[in-house]
Amino acid sequence: MEKLAEKISDSELEVMRVLWEADAPLPISDIRVALQQRKGWEPTTTKTLVQRLCNKQALAQEKRNVFYYRPLISQEEYQAWATNDLIHRLYRGSARNLVAALVHSDKLSNDDLQELRDYFKVEDEP
């Protein structure tokens, strides 16, 4: 997972998102339509990205009447890897420093902060 996730580009991640959201294998035509609507991508761009992800073993290809594609990595697995990678690369392995940066940023509302406080209180209780 670690080496694979490092190789998934931002554009390839968009393909993965389409498949994660679908929660079912999709033909290339459905993937193309979704990415054309979201990103304005040409069909050849989507086809290239899907092929790359298959080569990286991030997607499986299944022959029916046409090829269907499904992710071999769950969104949760990828998010866990990406979060861990972020913590190690930017915060020298300190999750505390990541949380501190979020708390001091303007990205969290007061409601978000209260929800986090409540979350940590529940986690601390036996």
Protein language model regions, located:
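Glycine-centered, phosphate/nucleic-acid-interacting loop/turn motifs that mediate DNA/RNA or nucleotide
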Residues: 57
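Short, cationic-aromatic polyanion-contact patches
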Residues: 7-11, 64-82
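Short, hydrophobic-biased segments on the C-terminal half of alpha helices
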Residues: 47-51
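Short alpha-helical segments that sit at the start of domains
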Residues: 1-18, 22, 126
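Short acidic, hydrophobic short linear motifs in intrinsically disordered regions
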Residues: 25-34
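Amphipathic alpha-helical dimerization/coiled-coil segments
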Residues: 83-124
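Short helix-coil junctions and helix-kink-helix linkers
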Residues: 33-41
